[in-house]
A protein has these predicted regions:
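N-terminal short leaders/motifs
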Residues: 42, 56-79, 171-214
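Short secondary-structure transition/capping segments
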Residues: 61-63, 89-100, 130-143, 221, ...
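Active-site-proximal loop/helix segment associated with metal-binding centers of metalloenzymes
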Residues: 128-198
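Metal-dependent phosphoesterase/phosphodiesterase active-site architecture
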Residues: 255-256, 262-272
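Core catalytic region of metal-dependent phosphoesterases/phosphodiesterases
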Residues: 2-11, 15, 20-118
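Phosphate-binding site recognition
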Residues: 121
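A short acidic, often aromatic-flanked loop/helix-cap motif at beta-alpha or helix-coil junctions
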Residues: 115-118, 243, 263-265
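Conserved beta-sheet core of the metallophosphoesterase superfamily
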Residues: 106-111, 124, 129, 133-141, ...
């Protein structure tokens, strides 16, 4: 097949765990500036997947909205205006942003695990909290943010109290240590080994409905980038937009994890 006959599929970009704060410090301001540049790159892709914890704290109260993310939100406005589809998977820090993201960017309301058929693959999307890394504080916070009772309790709290709780938990948001990384990869390998081999690609109209039929699973949350292959499937974890500034690109069925500071800018000039 010649290059002229090869039909390229729109590229898909993935990013997770930037943990942007309402009150950023100078180091975060640089990460924000680079995120704005990433959004400019995403304007040339077919899809941009925000895989959770983009915002370190988000809660919509009935009478006011917390401010501090305007630069990030405006950068995403540019992505949507360029025709790139934005997908949002809420993390344990920003699950409550789902409704707002739907209203502003047209993102579908996705369950904790969902499928996206794009980039030449069947992709299972999941933030990843609760999968591999046992942490009682995260477990408690996850229960709070994802349960109806927890949301009701949160709405009864003064915003400053909820913000203080989130700030305390965000202090635990860092890159995984070497020892933690080994544990995470070991548990991830065990999880993947327990998944059956994927079936053949079926009716395109039904694809995306069966959560067992995926070729590539992409998660965030663990703040450690890796890829594991088993039984015809790949499990990939994004390192987070921390240090390094990690993101992923899926193009024509090929998955790549990249460092925005160090790796060459990928060619995403594919037809939509």
């Amino acid at each position: 097949m010649t290059a002229m006959n090869h039909i390229q599929r729109p590229a898909v970009m993935f990013v997770a765990d930037s943990h942007f704060h309402l009150r950023p410090d100078p180091a975060e301001m640089r990460r924000r500036e680079r995120f704005v540049e990433l959004c400019r790159l995403a304007q040339r892709a077919g899809h941009l997947v925000l895989l959770g914890d983009i915002f370190d704290f988000w809660f919509d109260y009935p009478h006011f909205r917390l401010r501090g993310y305007e630069e990030v939100l405006q950068a995403l406005d540019g992505v949507r205006a360029a025709g790139t589809a934005i997908h949002f998977v809420g993390g344990n820090h920003d699950i409550w942003a789902a409704d707002y993201m739907h209203e502003r960017y047209g993102c579908g309301i996705r369950p904790p695990r969902s499928l996206l058929v794009a980039g030449g693959s069947r992709v299972m999307l999941c933030h990843g909290d609760g999968m591999f890394k046992l942490d009682w504080a995260y477990g408690a916070f996850r229960t709070l943010v994802r349960a109806r009772a927890g949301i009701a309790v949160a709405k009864s709290l003064h915003p400053e109290i909820l913000f203080t709780l989130s700030t305390w938990l965000s202090g635990r948001s860092r890159c995984a240590t070497r020892d933690e990384a080994r544990v995470i990869e070991s548990r991830a390998a065990s999880w993947l080994a327990g998944q059956p081999a994927p079936g053949p690609v079926g009716n395109p109209n039904l694809m995306g409905r069966d959560l067992t039929e995926w070729d590539l699973a992409i998660i965030g949350h663990v703040h450690h980038g890796f890829s594991i292959h088993e039984n015809g499937r790949t499990l990939a974890a994004l390192p987070g937009w921390l240090d390094p500034l990690g993101y992923g690109v899926l193009q024509d069925g090929q998955w790549r994890q990249l460092d925005f500071d160090r790796d060459p800018t990928p060619d995403l000039a594919t037809p939509r």
